[in-house]
């Protein structure tokens, strides 16, 4: 029967791979994801989540399970097509995919053609989700992930100060407001998982990502990060704090070296660098964690059973799924050089506790070595089911099997970057500014001044602001040309 279905697939259009109309799968109060005409346990919204996970796992093939363990980068980076095509039935994701990252958010090949007006991007994600629900055998929905450390990483979403600026506010209530704005805009646009907050501790100013941290203090980072996680997940999204663990103190401040400074002792590692993550997991209940690409004491974190299982799951009780930072898995093989083959690489990260591999390369670059590692006995079927089950559990908790099409494809502009959200942005910007010294009462500037010198490399910059891991093409201009213009809400 499987051979017959595969043969027919080549002859049928993308909208008619399965017998009958795909509209028939949408029943009253449930969806017939596997298209068998029967309400299976995993399709029953009233069934307990653990029962739904177990039922779905029991129906999955090895190919379908391994496809859940990879990210497909969207927006033309890896996923070259803007919309589903008939050729997708020949791609490895014909058996599903774990998540799709940054699809139609304004970055990558497609730019603004899909991301704005906002309704365009919602319709795009809905059509891609519809393909996975209707054209794959079991119809497992995709988790649409995106960045969001300073506002949602989407074209013209509401921007906030970088996390170092947010940290300077020392305002937990404000961080919760920022989280709600980010979550509301993500929900309106159909994203389901936000890669935030960054909980790395910045104590070496040479490190190039200091600006992305809440600061140098683990209590501050933990308290603010907790509010961000609670705020995102209160709106039905998954929060994925990063980068776990001990990532922000590389030797010489060199991020690309991937080597944690050997002077970081175990006690310092636990009380300083791990404490914000512990709080995010145990006190805020984060559903995701992103593993980092550095090592600690010579062991790559993304391939460490101690970090991903003993600490994260056994000590802290983490119940979500672990996604790797981009290329963190491959670094075991290419930078850390502790695995002689790609199969050994796949086996080490999965056995350690990693659920989903992310990289800017096709998902089969990981899925195929993963399958070979399983066939060679390097990964047990029990471990495979455990890792895939953790992914599915999060998808059930997000409600993707009850409503695979979140988002407002009609009027998302009433939510995204609305006036109320701009007010929160302005409030955060003002509170993030800290005056350390005011020699000769220079501030506030006298209204009697006739001239103000605007000096620096961006003095005449007229392009819209592009930030790291926040809104793309934000309508903010900082230049000599615009400084004399009156402030307008749309410039926030």
Task: State each model region's role.
Residues 1-4:
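Positively charged n-region of N-terminal signal peptides that target proteins for export
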Residues 10-11, 490:
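Short, linear, compositionally biased motifs with a strong N-terminal bias
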Residues 18-484:
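Glycoside hydrolase catalytic-domain context in secreted enzymes
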Residues 485-488, 492:
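Positively charged, low-complexity/disordered segments
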């Amino acid at each position: 029967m499987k051979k017959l279905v595969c043969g027919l697939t080549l002859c049928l259009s993308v909208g008619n791979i399965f017998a009958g109309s795909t509209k028939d799968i949408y029943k009253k109060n449930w969806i017939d994801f596997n298209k068998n005409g029967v309400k299976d346990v995993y399709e029953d919204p009233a069934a307990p989540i653990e029962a739904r996970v177990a039922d779905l796992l029991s129906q999955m093939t090895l190919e379908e399970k391994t496809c859940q363990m990879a990210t497909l980068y969207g927006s033309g980076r890896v996923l070259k097509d803007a919309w589903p095509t008939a050729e997708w039935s020949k791609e490895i994701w014909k058996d599903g995919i774990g998540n799709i990252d940054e699809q139609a958010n304004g970055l990558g090949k497609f730019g603004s053609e899909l991301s704005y007006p906002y309704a365009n991007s919602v319709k795009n994600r809905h059509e891609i989700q519809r393909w996975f629900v209707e054209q794959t055998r079991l119809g497992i929905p995709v988790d649409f992930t995106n960045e969001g450390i300073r506002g949602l990483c989407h074209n013209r979403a509401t921007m906030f100060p970088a996390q170092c600026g947010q940290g300077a506010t020392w305002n937990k209530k404000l961080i919760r407001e920022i989280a709600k704005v980010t979550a509301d805009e993500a929900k309106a646009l159909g994203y389901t998982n936000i890669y935030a907050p960054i909980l790395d501790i910045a104590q070496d100013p040479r490190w190039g990502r200091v600006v992305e941290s809440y600061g140098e203090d683990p209590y501050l980072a933990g308290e603010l990060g907790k509010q961000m996680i609670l705020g995102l997940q209160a709106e039905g999204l998954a929060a994925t704090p990063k980068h776990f663990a001990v990532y922000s103190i590389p030797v010489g401040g060199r991020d690309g070296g991937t080597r944690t400074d050997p002077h970081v002792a175990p006690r310092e590692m636990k009380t300083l660098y791990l404490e914000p993550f512990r709080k995010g997991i145990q006190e805020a209940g984060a559903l995701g964690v992103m593993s980092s690409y550095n090592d600690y004491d010579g062991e790559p974190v993304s391939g460490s059973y101690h970090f991903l299982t003993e600490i994260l799951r056994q000590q802290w009780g983490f119940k979500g799924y672990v996604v790797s930072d981009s290329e963190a898995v491959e670094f075991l093989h290419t930078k850390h050089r502790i695995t002689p083959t790609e199969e050994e690489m796949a086996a080490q990260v999965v056995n350690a506790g990693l659920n989903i591999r992310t990289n800017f390369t096709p998902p089969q670059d990981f899925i195929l070595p993963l399958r070979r590692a399983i066939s060679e006995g390097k990964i047990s079927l029990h471990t495979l089911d455990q890792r895939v089950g953790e992914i599915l559990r999060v998808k059930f908790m997000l409600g993707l099997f009850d409503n695979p099409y979140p988002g407002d494809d009609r009027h998302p502009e009433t939510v995204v970057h609305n006036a109320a959200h701009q007010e929160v942005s302005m409030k955060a910007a003002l509170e993030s500014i800290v005056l350390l010294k005011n020699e000769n009462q220079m501030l506030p500037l006298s209204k009697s001044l006739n001239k103000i010198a605007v000096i620096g490399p961006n003095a005449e910059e007229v392009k819209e602001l592009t930030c790291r891991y926040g809104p793309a093409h934000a309508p903010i201009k900082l230049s000599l040309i615009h400084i004399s213009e009156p402030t307008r809400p749309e410039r926030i």
